[in-house]
Design a protein with these regions (language model features):
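A detector of single, family-specific signature residues
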Residues: 1-222
Length: 222
Protein backbone atom coordinates (compact mmCIF):
# COMPACT_ATOMS: atom_id res chain seq x y z
CA UNK A 1 0.00 0.00 0.00
CA UNK A 2 1.16 3.52 -0.65
CA UNK A 3 -0.08 7.11 -0.65
CA UNK A 4 -3.51 7.38 0.96
CA UNK A 5 -3.77 3.61 1.42
CA UNK A 6 -1.61 3.26 4.51
CA UNK A 7 -2.50 1.70 7.83
CA UNK A 8 -1.25 4.81 9.64
CA UNK A 9 -3.61 7.05 7.68
CA UNK A 10 -6.55 4.75 8.31
CA UNK A 11 -5.77 4.48 12.03
CA UNK A 12 -5.55 8.26 12.36
CA UNK A 13 -8.74 9.01 10.42
CA UNK A 14 -10.73 6.38 12.32
CA UNK A 15 -9.78 8.05 15.59
CA UNK A 16 -9.78 11.65 14.37
CA UNK A 17 -11.70 11.99 11.07
CA UNK A 18 -11.62 15.81 10.99
CA UNK A 19 -8.88 18.50 11.11
CA UNK A 20 -10.33 19.81 14.39
CA UNK A 21 -9.98 16.41 16.07
CA UNK A 22 -6.42 15.95 14.75
CA UNK A 23 -5.47 19.45 15.93
CA UNK A 24 -6.74 18.70 19.45
CA UNK A 25 -4.90 15.38 19.82
CA UNK A 26 -2.09 15.19 22.38
CA UNK A 27 1.22 15.34 20.54
CA UNK A 28 2.63 12.22 22.20
CA UNK A 29 -0.47 10.20 21.37
CA UNK A 30 -0.55 11.42 17.74
CA UNK A 31 3.14 10.68 17.20
CA UNK A 32 2.85 7.22 18.77
CA UNK A 33 -0.30 6.37 16.78
CA UNK A 34 1.40 7.21 13.48
CA UNK A 35 4.69 5.56 14.41
CA UNK A 36 3.14 2.25 15.53
CA UNK A 37 0.79 1.94 12.54
CA UNK A 38 3.48 2.88 10.01
CA UNK A 39 6.09 0.55 11.55
CA UNK A 40 8.30 3.51 12.38
CA UNK A 41 8.06 5.34 9.04
CA UNK A 42 6.23 8.34 10.52
CA UNK A 43 8.54 10.43 12.71
CA UNK A 44 7.59 12.74 15.56
CA UNK A 45 8.56 15.73 13.39
CA UNK A 46 6.11 14.62 10.70
CA UNK A 47 3.41 14.22 13.33
CA UNK A 48 4.09 17.81 14.48
CA UNK A 49 3.84 19.07 10.90
CA UNK A 50 0.56 17.23 10.45
CA UNK A 51 -0.95 18.74 13.59
CA UNK A 52 0.15 22.24 12.53
CA UNK A 53 -1.53 21.73 9.15
CA UNK A 54 -4.70 20.54 10.89
CA UNK A 55 -4.66 23.62 13.15
CA UNK A 56 -4.35 25.86 10.08
CA UNK A 57 -7.16 24.10 8.21
CA UNK A 58 -10.16 26.33 7.57
CA UNK A 59 -12.55 23.54 6.46
CA UNK A 60 -15.99 23.26 7.99
CA UNK A 61 -16.30 20.80 10.86
CA UNK A 62 -19.05 18.61 9.36
CA UNK A 63 -19.86 15.62 11.57
CA UNK A 64 -21.64 13.89 8.66
CA UNK A 65 -18.40 13.94 6.63
CA UNK A 66 -16.47 12.57 9.62
CA UNK A 67 -18.92 9.66 9.92
CA UNK A 68 -18.68 9.02 6.17
CA UNK A 69 -14.87 8.94 6.34
CA UNK A 70 -14.93 6.43 9.21
CA UNK A 71 -17.44 4.18 7.43
CA UNK A 72 -15.53 4.34 4.13
CA UNK A 73 -12.31 3.25 5.85
CA UNK A 74 -14.15 0.36 7.52
CA UNK A 75 -15.48 -0.74 4.10
CA UNK A 76 -12.00 -0.56 2.56
CA UNK A 77 -10.53 -2.60 5.41
CA UNK A 78 -13.29 -5.21 5.02
CA UNK A 79 -12.60 -5.48 1.28
CA UNK A 80 -8.86 -5.72 1.99
CA UNK A 81 -9.50 -8.57 4.41
CA UNK A 82 -11.70 -10.41 1.91
CA UNK A 83 -9.12 -9.89 -0.85
CA UNK A 84 -6.38 -11.39 1.32
CA UNK A 85 -8.54 -14.48 1.94
CA UNK A 86 -9.22 -14.89 -1.79
CA UNK A 87 -5.52 -14.50 -2.60
CA UNK A 88 -4.62 -17.10 0.05
CA UNK A 89 -7.14 -19.54 -1.46
CA UNK A 90 -5.81 -18.85 -4.98
CA UNK A 91 -2.26 -19.50 -3.78
CA UNK A 92 -3.27 -22.85 -2.26
CA UNK A 93 -5.06 -23.88 -5.47
CA UNK A 94 -2.11 -22.88 -7.67
CA UNK A 95 0.33 -24.77 -5.45
CA UNK A 96 -1.85 -27.88 -5.79
CA UNK A 97 -2.32 -27.32 -9.54
CA UNK A 98 1.46 -27.04 -10.08
CA UNK A 99 1.15 -25.45 -13.54
CA UNK A 100 4.19 -25.33 -15.85
CA UNK A 101 3.92 -21.55 -16.07
CA UNK A 102 4.92 -21.35 -12.41
CA UNK A 103 8.44 -22.15 -13.66
CA UNK A 104 8.53 -18.68 -15.25
CA UNK A 105 10.75 -16.52 -12.98
CA UNK A 106 8.76 -13.96 -11.00
CA UNK A 107 5.27 -14.80 -12.28
CA UNK A 108 3.73 -15.46 -8.83
CA UNK A 109 0.75 -17.55 -7.74
CA UNK A 110 -1.87 -14.79 -8.09
CA UNK A 111 -0.87 -13.84 -11.64
CA UNK A 112 -0.63 -17.55 -12.46
CA UNK A 113 -4.19 -18.13 -11.23
CA UNK A 114 -5.60 -15.13 -13.09
CA UNK A 115 -3.84 -16.10 -16.33
CA UNK A 116 -4.87 -19.76 -16.23
CA UNK A 117 -8.40 -18.90 -15.13
CA UNK A 118 -8.91 -16.53 -18.06
CA UNK A 119 -7.22 -18.72 -20.69
CA UNK A 120 -9.04 -21.91 -19.72
CA UNK A 121 -8.27 -24.62 -22.28
CA UNK A 122 -5.17 -23.52 -24.21
CA UNK A 123 -6.31 -25.60 -27.20
CA UNK A 124 -8.99 -22.98 -27.84
CA UNK A 125 -6.14 -20.94 -29.30
CA UNK A 126 -4.59 -22.56 -32.38
CA UNK A 127 -1.69 -20.09 -32.40
CA UNK A 128 -0.18 -17.46 -30.06
CA UNK A 129 -1.63 -14.56 -32.07
CA UNK A 130 -5.14 -15.71 -31.16
CA UNK A 131 -4.17 -15.71 -27.50
CA UNK A 132 -2.66 -12.24 -27.95
CA UNK A 133 -5.93 -11.01 -29.46
CA UNK A 134 -7.93 -12.57 -26.61
CA UNK A 135 -5.73 -10.70 -24.13
CA UNK A 136 -6.12 -7.43 -26.04
CA UNK A 137 -2.41 -7.37 -26.90
CA UNK A 138 -2.72 -6.93 -30.65
CA UNK A 139 0.34 -7.34 -32.92
CA UNK A 140 0.39 -4.47 -35.43
CA UNK A 141 2.63 -3.45 -38.32
CA UNK A 142 3.27 0.21 -39.11
CA UNK A 143 4.75 1.02 -42.52
CA UNK A 144 6.10 4.31 -43.89
CA UNK A 145 8.05 4.31 -47.14
CA UNK A 146 10.75 1.66 -46.85
CA UNK A 147 10.42 1.49 -43.07
CA UNK A 148 8.36 -1.22 -41.41
CA UNK A 149 7.99 -1.68 -37.67
CA UNK A 150 6.15 -4.35 -35.71
CA UNK A 151 4.77 -3.56 -32.29
CA UNK A 152 2.41 -4.96 -29.69
CA UNK A 153 -0.19 -2.41 -28.67
CA UNK A 154 -2.71 -2.47 -25.86
CA UNK A 155 -6.36 -2.73 -26.86
CA UNK A 156 -9.64 -2.22 -25.03
CA UNK A 157 -10.84 -5.47 -26.57
CA UNK A 158 -10.32 -8.91 -25.12
CA UNK A 159 -10.13 -9.95 -21.48
CA UNK A 160 -9.23 -7.05 -19.21
CA UNK A 161 -8.44 -9.45 -16.38
CA UNK A 162 -6.01 -11.43 -18.55
CA UNK A 163 -4.41 -8.26 -19.90
CA UNK A 164 -3.93 -6.88 -16.38
CA UNK A 165 -2.44 -10.15 -15.11
CA UNK A 166 -0.11 -10.46 -18.11
CA UNK A 167 1.20 -6.90 -17.89
CA UNK A 168 1.67 -7.21 -14.13
CA UNK A 169 3.39 -10.59 -14.53
CA UNK A 170 5.56 -9.26 -17.36
CA UNK A 171 7.08 -6.54 -15.21
CA UNK A 172 7.95 -9.15 -12.56
CA UNK A 173 9.47 -11.41 -15.23
CA UNK A 174 11.51 -8.51 -16.67
CA UNK A 175 13.00 -7.96 -13.22
CA UNK A 176 13.74 -11.66 -12.69
CA UNK A 177 14.93 -12.92 -16.08
CA UNK A 178 17.98 -11.67 -17.98
CA UNK A 179 16.52 -12.38 -21.45
CA UNK A 180 13.33 -10.42 -20.80
CA UNK A 181 15.33 -7.63 -19.11
CA UNK A 182 17.59 -7.34 -22.16
CA UNK A 183 14.55 -7.24 -24.45
CA UNK A 184 12.91 -4.55 -22.32
CA UNK A 185 16.13 -2.50 -22.22
CA UNK A 186 16.49 -2.79 -26.00
CA UNK A 187 12.99 -1.40 -26.54
CA UNK A 188 13.66 1.43 -24.10
CA UNK A 189 16.91 2.17 -25.95
CA UNK A 190 14.85 2.52 -29.15
CA UNK A 191 13.05 5.40 -27.45
CA UNK A 192 9.89 3.57 -26.44
CA UNK A 193 8.14 4.47 -23.20
CA UNK A 194 8.10 2.09 -20.23
CA UNK A 195 4.51 1.11 -21.00
CA UNK A 196 5.17 0.42 -24.70
CA UNK A 197 8.35 -1.53 -23.93
CA UNK A 198 6.32 -3.55 -21.42
CA UNK A 199 3.73 -4.18 -24.14
CA UNK A 200 6.42 -5.73 -26.34
CA UNK A 201 7.59 -7.89 -23.44
CA UNK A 202 4.00 -8.92 -22.66
CA UNK A 203 3.63 -10.06 -26.28
CA UNK A 204 6.78 -12.12 -25.93
CA UNK A 205 5.54 -13.60 -22.63
CA UNK A 206 2.21 -14.59 -24.21
CA UNK A 207 4.04 -16.52 -26.92
CA UNK A 208 6.16 -18.25 -24.29
CA UNK A 209 3.08 -19.13 -22.19
CA UNK A 210 1.23 -20.44 -25.26
CA UNK A 211 4.15 -22.73 -26.11
CA UNK A 212 4.55 -23.93 -22.52
CA UNK A 213 0.86 -24.75 -22.04
CA UNK A 214 0.44 -26.28 -25.51
CA UNK A 215 3.45 -28.59 -25.22
CA UNK A 216 3.37 -28.94 -21.40
CA UNK A 217 7.00 -27.85 -21.10
CA UNK A 218 8.73 -25.82 -18.40
CA UNK A 219 10.21 -22.37 -18.93
CA UNK A 220 13.33 -22.48 -21.10
CA UNK A 221 14.29 -19.75 -23.56
CA UNK A 222 17.21 -21.67 -25.06
Amino acid sequence: KSGLHQNAVYALLKEAPSPKEIASMHMTHLANLLKVNSHGHFTKEQAKELRVLAQKSVGANDSAISIQITQTIQQIELLDSQLKKIEAEMTDIMKFNDSVIMTIPGIGYINDGMILGEIGDIHRFSNPNKLLAFAGLVPSVYQSGNFQAKTTKMSKRGSRVLRYALVNATWNVVRNNATFKAYYDAKRAEGRSHYKALGHCAGKLVRVIWKMLTDEVEFNLE
